[in-house]
């Protein structure tokens, strides 16, 4: 879960002396969490909560509002903005306006934005998603037999236990179901049913 008792969290933890904390009264670090040297925690736009045993590694940037779940790791040099990260996740690269549920990994460089990622998902190195159309029109997402108008910014919805290969390109407003194994060159289809395999969804 996402720490149901976050406001009961023992927030007496601190960051390394070389870190920069902006609006530090809105930065809540668990006593058992570690915020490593050179990291920046910017709570100008919302609170930042670093939960029990989480690690924000060297030189990472976290802009609030943000929640880093129990036992999760934010990799060195990562850039996170407006995120909710569940427990036991490993997150690197650039992530914004996105939820990662527990036990999901995006360890390497690549951009994921305006997206919703289930549990036990693994995104291979340099997996990227688009979240804005070139003509700035609203994004439509197919869910089952219906299409939903998701507004100007919408990335991807990825179901539990799905994996992507290295350098996977995910189009604007893409739906990927449960238990998929996605790989191959070029943009993936915008609707990938559960248990699909490969670039052609076979």
Predicted segments, located by residue:
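Glycine-rich phosphate/diphosphate-binding loop of Rossmann-like nucleotide-binding domains
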Residues: 37-39, 44-71, 76-77, 82, ...
């Amino acid at each position: 879960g996402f720490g149901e008792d976050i406001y009961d969290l023992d927030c007496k933890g601190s960051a390394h002396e070389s870190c920069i904390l902006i609006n530090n009264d809105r930065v809540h670090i668990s006593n058992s969490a570690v915020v490593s040297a050179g990291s920046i925690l910017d709570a100008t736009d919302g609170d930042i909560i670093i939960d029990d045993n989480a690690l924000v590694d060297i030189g990472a940037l976290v802009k609030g509002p943000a929640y880093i779940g129990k036992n999760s790791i934010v990799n060195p040099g990562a850039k996170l903005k407006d995120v909710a990260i569940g427990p036991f996740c490993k997150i690197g690269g650039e992530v914004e306006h996105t939820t990662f549920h527990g036990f999901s990994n995006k360890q390497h460089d690549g951009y994921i934005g305006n997206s919703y990622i289930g549990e036990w998902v693994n995104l291979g190195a340099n997996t990227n998603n688009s979240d804005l159309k070139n003509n700035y029109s609203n994004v439509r997402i197919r869910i089952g037999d219906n299409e939903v108008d998701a507004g100007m910014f919408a990335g991807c919805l990825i179901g539990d236990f799905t994996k992507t290969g290295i350098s996977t390109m995910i189009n604007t407003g893409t739906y990927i179901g449960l238990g998929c194994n996605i790989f191959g060159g070029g943009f993936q289809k915008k609707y990938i049913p559960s248990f699909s395999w490969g670039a052609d969804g076979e």
